[in-house]
């Protein structure tokens, strides 16, 4: 496993839509492991492949102290009508934090590293992280959704 270089706001790759992963091979597994190392090294709770310069639909998330989600081709199936506004930051936008409104609950679907299709019901911080990271896969940064800047 190795650290990958982060891409920062202003890098055009962060504004491009990522491609579906069709084969889960050693390159994808290594990418996910490297993303986890890079996320931890930078004190993050989530990281999407475009943030390390790879336009593939891959995300890693750890909001629960070591309960790591490795998500391939994640997508949101449904969201709660109720939203919560909370502060967000981003490893690719280091100097900015802001209040962003997100659904309190989401139902998401993704493929795990063994090729199994997983459906997850998430709420709170995990739901927020899933939405934030999937936004990255679609070329959207949290700064596009800020209601009020806090830093």
Label every PLM stretch briefly.
Residues 1-151:
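Positively charged
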